Design a protein with these regions (language model features):
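Ribonuclease/tRNase effector modules and their secretory precursors
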Residues: 1-113
Length: 113
């Protein structure tokens, strides 16, 4: 299996995000707070998912600034998608989070057509 051309870029991106989140340099959008409450995603699960996550989509031209979609798993094995800003911001902005629907995602990484 070949490595996609964006692999190194995605690895550098998640590494930078992990460092900031581990040091507490992140904040939640109001939307993320609302969605985390509705979807029962506690702060610890955000941290766990980012700590072992990978960037699966990149949105360099997102309307509020570059962001990406991270897939990570909690220690309980729960898959979580987290959309967050790139690490170029002083604080990582958590934009939204949800548990991916298997009917919409294959292996939680690739959108079904």
């Amino acid at each position: 299996m070949s490595v996609p051309p964006c692999y190194d870029e995605f690895m550098a991106l998640i590494d930078a995000i992990r460092v900031k989140v581990a040091s507490g340099d992140f904040e939640y959008s109001q939307h993320a707070v609302d969605q985390a409450t509705l979807r029962h995603i506690p702060v610890q699960e955000f941290r766990e998912a980012i700590a072992n996550g990978e960037v699966i989509e990149d949105y360099p031209n997102d309307k509020y600034g570059p962001s990406c979609l991270v897939l990570g798993f909690t220690t309980a094995g729960r898959p979580i998608h987290i959309q967050c800003s790139h690490a170029s911001r002083s604080l990582i902005k958590i934009i939204t989070a949800y548990q991916p629907d298997p009917d919409e995602w294959t292996d939680f990484k690739h959108r079904r057509s």
